[in-house]
């Protein structure tokens, strides 16, 4: 059960703002010193660990063997604003997230995600598709030599966080699966459970708890032979949704509390 209080707000909000401000300033300093983008992402990973510790949120991960070391699209069900810190903690590569353009206007936070190269999602579907396609093309061309971090394009295919207390997923947007097919990028499905209990949609105070991340077996566009590009993207969409839904069911069965 969620327990929000003035005491929690007075403790959490200043701490979060301090961490975000410090991280942003450190990253800007790294840019001045011409640090590599990989080193800057390392800074973001460290910041994420501090944030999770501050909020008393634990991340439990299974299926790490399914996190392939090649450019890919990560698809996860969207439960909470904690999904991004959870993935940054789980995925040690260079994760590029999509964020609504409004988030880039938030003081301190917006500048921070811009520096990290987060992708601006527009209300115009055609413009968003073009931006995502360019991002997919960019990570596909990344050379993984000299210990470079593996790039992943992280997308929440529902497009918005769920409000359903039973974690029922919303409709998946097909556009990203067309992009996966176009650029022949594998999809790594991740099922996530627990974020909604820490901070539901619309809330900005956090309860302590655990987020369970289950990395599932990747799906490869080239495995769908003998069908049109449109049919291939539809099959990829349906199979990704089923895989995440099945994984989510397993997490709920293993970790939900009675009542």
What residues fall within each predicted segment?
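Membrane-anchoring hydrophobic helices of lipid-metabolizing enzymes
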Residues: 1-72, 85
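Non-catalytic C-terminal accessory region of glycerolipid acyltransferases
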Residues: 2, 6, 133-259
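Hydrophobic alpha-helical segments of integral membrane proteins
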Residues: 43-51, 55, 109-112, 135, ...
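Residue-level detector of anion-binding/catalytic polar loops
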Residues: 58, 119, 186
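Generic structural signal for helix capping and beta-alpha/helix-loop junctions
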Residues: 69, 105-107, 130, 163, ...
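Structural motif
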Residues: 125-134
């Amino acid at each position: 059960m969620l327990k929000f209080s003035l005491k929690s707000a007075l403790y959490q909000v200043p701490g979060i703002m301090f961490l975000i401000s410090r991280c942003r300033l450190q990253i800007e300093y790294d840019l001045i010193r011409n640090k590599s983008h990989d080193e800057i992402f390392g800074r973001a990973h460290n910041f994420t660990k501090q944030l999770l510790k501050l909020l008393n949120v634990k991340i439990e991960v299974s299926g790490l063997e399914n996190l392939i070391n090649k450019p890919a699209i990560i698809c996860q069900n969207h439960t909470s604003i904690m999904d991004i810190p959870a993935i940054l903690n789980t995925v040690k590569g260079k994760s590029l997230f999509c964020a609504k353009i409004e988030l880039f206007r938030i003081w301190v936070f917006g500048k921070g995600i811009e520096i990290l190269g987060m992708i601006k999602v527009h209300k115009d579907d055609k413009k968003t598709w073009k931006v995502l396609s360019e991002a997919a093309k960019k990570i596909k061309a990344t050379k993984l030599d000299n210990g470079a971090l593996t790039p992943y394009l992280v997308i929440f295919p529902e497009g918005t966080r769920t409000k359903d207390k039973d974690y029922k997923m919303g409709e998946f947007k097909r556009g990203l699966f067309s992009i996966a097919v176009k650029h022949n990028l594998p999809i790594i499905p991740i099922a996530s459970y627990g974020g909604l209990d820490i901070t539901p949609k619309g809330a900005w105070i956090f309860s302590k708890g655990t987020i369970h991340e289950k990395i599932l077996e990747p799906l490869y566009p080239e495995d769908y032979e003998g069908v049109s590009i449109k049919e291939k993207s539809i099959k990829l969409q349906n199979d990704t949704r089923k895989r995440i839904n099945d994984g989510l069911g397993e997490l709920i069965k293993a970790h939900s509390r009675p009542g």
